[in-house]
Amino acid sequence: MRKIIMLLLVSLSIVSCNKAKSPKTEVSIVGDEFYINGKPTFEGKTWRGMKIQGLLPNARLVNGIFDDKTDSTRYKWVYPDTKVWDANRNTKEFVENMPKWQEKGLLAFTINLQGGSPEGYSKKQAWHNSAIMPDGSLDMEYMNRLKLILDKADELQMVVILGLYYFGQEKYMNDSVSVKNGIKNAVEWILKHDYRNVLLEINNECDFYKLDGLNPETVHKSIEYAKTITHNGRRLLVSTSYAGKKVPSDKVIAVSDFILLHGNSIRNPEDITVQVDSVRKSTAYTTKPIVYNEDDHFKFDEEVNNFVKATDAYASWGYFDFRKKDEPFEQGFQCIPADWGINSERKKGFFNILTEWKNAQ
């Protein structure tokens, strides 16, 4: 009897351990298609007569681990109900809403170790928000919040486009050596935690940086460097982004695993086609996915908009929505404090299209 009881306890222990292990979500690229766990996204599906297999619709949710290390600006981000800023609450509410986004059809989102402007667009950025310290080491309070998000994304089979640097925070980095250290430390952290659902964006809109390794003349070297960092024979898929309407340099197109574009400033949807075609016509381009991960144009109720034209050009599209002046708390996914729920008409318009994709044949 004792042996039977012991065997049962061992069996229960094994089952318990197996349940504790999170299923790994792995993103990969085959040609110009994204695969999740060995299968193309939206396998075999079309939408309005357009191929969507292999595309990666996404949203810019860069401030999921936001905090402000500057006492003089922290007051700007207080919640309307508590009148206090709370970085842990921000991440907690982000994670709580992730299943709702996934259920509506969102496959991926961009988050950044230095966030993005908590005001949407800003002329001056006095706040200090960075998971990367001035010397390139990592701030573990930020990384612990990031882990909550990456773990949940892994569970939900969602892909994370992880940005490292944001131009508003470049001034807090010591020098180009610290930038390189930051790349090394962040990539090694991702690999050693065995996250396989992460795509890497070196920096958001490289046009605006001055430091070597981040500026448009040298960022291709950082892409190449990040690709050399491995753990157990595995590396991350790497790219970077430029400002709205810009086409990446031939050097960046050549070394990137996928191409990132921004649609800000593109008011005529036909210009989306021009931008995508310009990438494919580059002599440096080889077959690889093209992804918008920032576009602040909507009009989702109209037959033609930037989302539709990107899809028609076979490029994944990314939704960027921030709360405009005098808009209520529910608006936008970037301004802090953020309402991470789908509680505005703009958000509902975007997610309604994703639901159409999810249910497409």
Region locations from a protein language model:
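Generic structural signal for short, solvent-exposed loop/turn connectors between secondary structure elements
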Residues: 1-3, 21, 167-181, 245, ...
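Bacterial Sec-dependent N-terminal signal peptides
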Residues: 1-23
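Basic side chains
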Residues: 2-3, 60, 110, 288
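Generic hydrophobic-segment detector
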Residues: 3-6, 28-29, 143
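Generic N-terminal initiation segments characterized by hydrophobic and/or small/turn-forming residues
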Residues: 4-9, 53, 153, 258, ...
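Extended substrate-binding grooves/exosites of carbohydrate-active enzymes
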Residues: 25, 32-33, 40-88, 287-292, ...
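Active-site mouth of glycoside hydrolases
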Residues: 30, 35, 40-41, 46-256, ...
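Extracellular glycoside hydrolase catalytic/binding regions
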Residues: 182-184, 197-199, 203-351
